[in-house]
């Protein structure tokens, strides 16, 4: 068995030496850049710069004449919403517990036939039934 393993390892080593297995990152980057240029070549850098300049920096700033409610911080908004969330979570939890209490449990006991009604238990009852012994 070890002879076959060493033979296959040697064959693999010989193939790796012949192929000169090295990463070819330069080639893959060139291929990727060519593919991207083919796919998205219709976008020039000038067009991208023009589109970036069309979006004014003033449009990205918030309006200074807005309400105070618009300017509140995210954590303030979250703390205000916590009361509503906790009420919803409590209602959901109550409904879940009520559903669990109303529905019968799927697994009741050892088997579908009910509890064992024998004197000695399930395994001993089988042995007694086969041997003719009774309770």
UniProtKB/Swiss-Prot annotation:
MF terms in GO: hormone activity
InterPro entries, per the entry: C_natriurtcpep, Natr_peptide, Natr_peptide_CS
Gene Ontology biological-process entries: blood vessel diameter maintenance; cGMP biosynthetic process; receptor guanylyl cyclase signaling pathway
Keyword set includes Disulfide bond: yes
Propeptide: 26-113
Signal sequence interval, chain numbering: 1-25
Localization per Swiss-Prot or TrEMBL: Secreted
Alphabetized UniProt keyword annotations: Cleavage on pair of basic residues, Disulfide bond, Hormone, Secreted, Signal, Vasoactive
Coiled-coil ranges per UniProt: none
Transmembrane segments: none
Chain positions covered by the region annotation Disordered: 46-67
Cysteine disulfide partners in this protein: 119-135
Broad class of where this protein is predominantly found: secreted
Keyword Nucleotide-binding included in the entry's annotation: no
Listed PROSITE patterns: NATRIURETIC_PEPTIDE
Example of a GO cellular component annotation carried by this entry: extracellular region
Function: Hormone which may be vasoactive and natriuretic. Has a cGMP-stimulating activity.
PANTHER family: C-TYPE NATRIURETIC PEPTIDE, C-TYPE NATRIURETIC PEPTIDE 3-LIKE PRECURSOR
Family of the protein in this entry: Belongs to the natriuretic peptide family.
Name by which UniProt lists this protein: C-type natriuretic peptide
Organism (species): Squalus acanthias (Spiny dogfish)
